[in-house]
Each structure stands twice: as structure tokens, then as C-alpha cells.
A protein has these predicted regions:
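Bacterial N-terminal signal peptides that target proteins for export
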Residues: 2-17
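Primary mode marks residue(s) on the alpha4-beta5-alpha5 output face of response regulator receiver
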Residues: 46, 50, 149-150
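Short, charged/polar surface micro-motifs in flexible loops or helix N-caps
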Residues: 83-90
Length: 168
């Protein structure tokens, strides 16, 4: 059976167009990030393999650094595993789905959340104009929970006050 030339040309053009579209969708630029100091920690590898395909309804993006993650286009949620483990702080500490997070709003509307009481520490930067911080932290809780908690945030009510006046 002979196929008419015009049909063969249209089929070839359609196939070329489809192939081009597939290639272009796979060529989205990786989100440029720097790895954290302790990104080579094996616990970070476990976190990365458990990262969700979407966070706060934002699709996962490829990154160019070890132990990182990004979601949204442009990226609205960024993750770094292996950041410096925070010590005691006066910044607010929130517990979201069993994970303690220190909240830093110094760059609002971009909020920085860092795990407290986990080593390696994980930092999440959220553009609150694009996504809900709470939703993003809930979506990431399963991956982050792979790093065991060794301590927890304390509030003023958790710290015992001395019952006697100190002697001089």
C-alpha cells in the first residue's frame, strides 16, 4: 500500500514537533543552589530520596547542588540539608507535624525555617507570597522526619526558675 506524499510529510512534521516538545520540556534549567557545609552527611541523602514530587502544589524542580531541593517555577520553596545545627535562640520555634522549626522572618516575605534538634539540620526557604509556609512544612515533614530528633524547642514555661535567691 502506498501512502500519499502529503500524508507522509504531515506525519513526519507532527512526529518532529512532538519530539521537539518532549526535548524542550526536559531542558528546563536546574535551580542554581549552593550545597550546605554538611551536605555530604548520609542522612541528607536519605532526606533527598524521600522528597515529595510536589510541595504546596508546586512541582519539584531539578537543582545543581547536593542535598538540595526546589519546588515551583520560579522556585517558591528551596531546601538545603546539612546547614549549621542551630543552638538556643530567641527566634520563634514552631512544631509542625512533629518537626520543630525555627522561623526567621528577617527577609519576609521569604521565610527561613531551620529544623531544631536534628543533626544534620535542614533549612527551608519559602516565598510566602507564592505558597503557604505551613502547607510546605507539612508536605516536607515525612522526608525531614528521617533525621531523628535529639532535642526539642523549649519555651519560657519549660525552663524551671530558681526558687531561692542566689547567694553572693
Amino acid at each position: 500500500m502506498m501512502i500519499p506524499r502529503s500524508l507522509a510529510l504531515r506525519s513526519g512534521a507532527a512526529a518532529s514537533l512532538l519530539l521537539s516538545a518532549l526535548l524542550l520540556t526536559g531542558c528546563a534549567a536546574a535551580v542554581p543552589l549552593e550545597p550546605a557545609a554538611d551536605a555530604i552527611n548520609p542522612a541528607c541523602a536519605d532526606v533527598v530520596v524521600h522528597l515529595p514530587a510536589s510541595v504546596a502544589d508546586q512541582p519539584a524542580r531539578e537543582t545543581n547542588a547536593q542535598a538540595t531541593g526546589a519546588w515551583g517555577d520560579p522556585a517558591a520553596v528551596l531546601m538545603h540539608c546539612g546547614v549549621t545545627v542551630p543552638g538556643p535562640t530567641t527566634l520563634p520555634c514552631l512544631n509542625v507535624n512533629g518537626i520543630d522549626w525555627i522561623e526567621d522572618d528577617a527577609d519576609a516575605p521569604r521565610y527561613r525555617y531551620t529544623t531544631y534538634g536534628r543533626d544534620p539540620a535542614i533549612e527551608i526557604v519559602i516565598d510566602s507570597e507564592k505558597v503557604s509556609g505551613t502547607t510546605a512544612l507539612v508536605d516536607l515533614a515525612s522526608a525531614v522526619s528521617g533525621v531523628p530528633a535529639t532535642s526539642a524547642c523549649l519555651g519560657v514555661e519549660d525552663v524551671p526558675l530558681p526558687t531561692e535567691a542566689p547567694s553572693l
